Amino acid sequence: MSIRLYILFFFVLSTLSGISQQLSGVVYDAEHSVALPFVSVYLVETDESTLTDSSGLFSLKAPELKSFHIRFVAMGYESTTLLCAGDSPVITARLIPKHLDLHEVTVSGALSQAQSENPFHIESRKIDDLTAVAAMNMGEAIARIPGVYQSSLGNGIAKPVVRGLQGMRVVTLMNGLRIESQQWGGDHGMGITDLGLGNVEVIKGPASLLYGADALAGVVYFNDQPHAPTGKREIESKTLFQSNTMGVTQRFMYREAREKVRWQLGAGYGNHADFQLPNGRFAQNSRFNEAVLKSVLSFNGKRSVHHLRYTFSHTTSGIPGHTHDSLATPESFQVETQRRSYTLPAQFFNNHFISFDNKWFGERSELQILAGATSNRLIEYDEKVTIPSLSMSLTNALYNAKFVARPLGDKWKIIAGLQGMHQWNLNAENASDRLVPDSRTFDQGAYLTTQYGNARWNVQAGVRYDVRLLRAFEESVESFNRTYQGVNASAGGVYHTEWATFRASYSSGYRAPHLTELLSNGFHHGALRYEIGDADLNPEYARQADVTVELTGEHLVLLYNPFVNAIRDYIYLQPLGYDVDGIPAFAYDVLSEVAFYGNDVGIHYHPHFAHDLHFETTWSYINTRTPTDSSVSLLPPQRLQTTLKYSFDRNRKFGLREVNVMHTFMDAQRKVAFMETPSESYNVLDAAMAFELTGKQRWEFRLGVKNILNERFIDHLSRLKNIAMPAPGRNFYLSVQFKM
């Protein structure tokens, strides 16, 4: 009932008089001083947009603010964000032709702050760029970002690994809503598809200050695609076929925007059979299917903007490599026939995400309040058709309140915030096993941060306090009650010139032990292990130093980003060396301290003699240091990713738009934990090309091949490594996308 009252309260506040301030401008090519038509113009604070006309002119209505950000995006030009005064009658923007760009330069979805002004290095990528070579899921797509890997269980389940850490240490947000989807399990996916998403931002390392406790590895922040331009409607449909799984993925989005109200509706479906191995056989029970629905409703007041978002997803996924037979061989999980219909063992996931995001603007201040809820239903079937082995419901009610003050104008900013989450975890009565008891968790956090910047320098510092109350119940009787608390701080600075950017930052993080680490005592069939918790575990504390040096020339960009992340009381799963009913037993243990260190290096070269040719390579290196033996498992090996892209003339009605060739070298991993096996190095070569047909409607055709050489390899982070199951073999794909 209280949630309904909050929503009604916010809705009443939003019914103020409409926006009255008119904003107009013109966009030019900076080199040739010619007007640019069809440039996308985004007003960042209100999420409104429009297009320039044939003369480069644009007009839209803006809120009555002292200042605001306007972002200009055009194909073939560098994205530009301008900070404009509220009384600016006419705005002139000059876009620089894009010769090279190591990473997408956007305004951070969390702070409405240009990344060039952010002391903390953020990797930002468009979803379209990450899927230039088709990806099976979002985990695979974002693993193409330096320092980010994926831990997968076949094709249907994948989650991000950031600088060697995963699971509960990675916080995922979608448009500011924290996503909780039982991410503690290695066999549980993200619950997020690419439907309606525009870009993703990754903060690597402890990021608890603004995003809450637990983010020791970092934050993965997904942003929706922008609304249609005011007065316009857009229809987008995409179909993707992949030969390796004989799989089809369908996406559909409808967008419409009026003066005060904008909305989006979307639906998607995917169905994939068992994936084919390089030897021509198939990975038994690696099939999966998914369905997703999405809606967005946005509306504006005189000095406010409001977004109501809802997403539903359902996934059915087989569990490959599952067995109780201790004498099973790798060949027993490879079959001659590819199948699509699900068989046991299998997992079923239902996810509901709903959020109501509100912003009110003052003369020199801004108030943002987000209220939301997430619901995750997980059902695992092992061998019994009618009785699930696990059946759990995870429900979260959360809020995020943030106040931004600019007492001395835009140079100085003070941010104060409150965050809270109430979580219920319940087991179904009909499940045969209970991995963890029923529980309730209450999180509360408060933070204060300040930022100061000028034309060259930007500095930021802040502090945060978190408290977590955790209660567990056995047969409705309280059996466990703990309170955890922690204080974190961060500070950083950035200095930028026309040719260089230097960043240095320090941040700390705090993570209370999760319910599964404390109280597990049962079979986790999806992960194929018997897990035993430790009720006396202490919280983890992390401290990271991070430096970024970025040098930019006319035809070359160099980036060097070393880091050290030291974690105290590191919690890990320790194999016990024996089985329980044919399933290996593991217990949660603690390491006094472990240091993760390494670097990301990037090079983007654009030769002067070939303006349409782009060569980009990134190298990611991660290692650990512990006071005793290495108890850190699943440490990502060194990785070298190289992309060669050639863009063709876009002035033709139909033609080849671009060609992409991508090569990945994954080094061998010899640094392993107790009872963990090493991994060999491998090379994977992918290629893709895109054709475009323009007119009243725009058609895009993409075709490509993944794993062109049909390389047989087993990724070190694969959850199927223990049964020697290789990754998918050669995969031809074709996608058709329609926009109008």
Predicted regions located by residue number:
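Conserved aromatic beta-strand anchor motif in extracellular beta-sandwich/beta-rich domains
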Residues: 43, 172-174
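Bacterial Sec-dependent N-terminal signal peptides
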Residues: 1-26, 41, 102, 740
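Outer-membrane beta-barrel proteins, especially TonB-dependent receptors
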Residues: 99, 106-133, 140, 151-165, ...
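Short aromatic/basic micro-patch
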Residues: 35, 124, 173, 191, ...
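Short beta-strand/loop motifs in extracellular/secreted proteins, especially
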Residues: 37-39, 68, 168-170, 365, ...
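A short linear hydrophobic-aromatic micro-motif
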Residues: 50, 148-151
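Periplasm-facing N-terminal accessory domains of Gram-negative outer-membrane beta-barrel systems
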Residues: 19-103, 163
